[in-house]
């Protein structure tokens, strides 16, 4: 009887181990993981990356016919006819770029004169393991007041995340907003929402 009881315990333990292994395999252990998109956020999807945007805060996707040719995807926050926030994805925006550092240098050059860099750091993104290395640049700038942007002199906050996808295509993902409209936690969530393919 003891043997039967022990055997039953081993069978139960074996079933639990098999179930755990099955769940691990289904969850993609060692494979592609995805960024964490917070509740109340939407997602912009492109062939190289996907990124979250704060939909509940008023951001909405811009139709392809309305966005600039350099942008693969855009979400805008428009208030009283002014673009007070933007999330954009640019792909293949520079030539001769082979890694995250080079992508960040090219993307950083596009931040513009008069911008103040606040921080630059290496980050690890979710997604294809070969393409997870990226660089984050935090900066501030002053709105020009042109092209439906906030009044001239308005301080703006920005973050750009740059890297190279698994097919060696450089990407730059930006979020800009009127300073104070997005918290540091929101900006961290933006970076954490990225999945690179």
PLM features per residue range, with description:
Residues 50-105:
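Secretory pathway targeting signatures of secreted, lumenal, and periplasmic proteins
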Residues 37, 45, 64-70, 124-133:
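Short, ordered beta-strand-loop transition motifs
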Residues 3-16:
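Bacterial N-terminal signal peptides that target proteins for export
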Residues 105-162:
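Signature of long, low-cysteine stretches enriched in small and polar/charged residues
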Residues 29-47:
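Short, low-complexity, disordered segments immediately C-terminal to signal peptides
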Residues 101-108, 157, 184-191:
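Extracytoplasmic/secreted envelope proteins and their assembly/folding machinery
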Residues 24-28:
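C-terminal motif of bacterial Sec signal peptides marking the signal peptidase cleavage site
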């Amino acid at each position: 009887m003891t043997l039967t009881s022990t055997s039953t315990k081993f069978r139960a333990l074996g079933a639990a181990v098999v179930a755990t292994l099955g769940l691990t395999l289904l969850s993609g252990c060692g494979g592609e993981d995805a960024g964490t998109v917070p509740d109340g956020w939407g997602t912009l999807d492109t062939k190289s990356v996907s990124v979250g945007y704060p939909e509940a805060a008023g951001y909405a996707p811009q139709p392809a016919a309305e966005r600039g040719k350099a942008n693969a995807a855009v979400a805008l926050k428009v208030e009283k006819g002014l673009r007070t926030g933007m999330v954009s994805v640019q792909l293949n925006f520079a030539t001769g770029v082979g890694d995250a550092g080079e992508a960040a240098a090219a993307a950083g050059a596009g931040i513009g004169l008069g911008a103040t860099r606040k921080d630059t750091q290496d980050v690890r993104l979710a997604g294809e393991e070969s393409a997870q290395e990226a660089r984050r640049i935090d900066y501030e700038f002053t709105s020009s007041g042109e092209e439906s942007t906030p009044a001239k002199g308005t301080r703006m906050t920005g973050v750009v995340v740059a890297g190279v996808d698994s097919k060696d295509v450089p990407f730059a993902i930006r979020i800009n907003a009127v300073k104070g409209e997005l918290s540091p936690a929101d900006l961290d969530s933006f970076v954490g929402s990225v999945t690179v393919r």
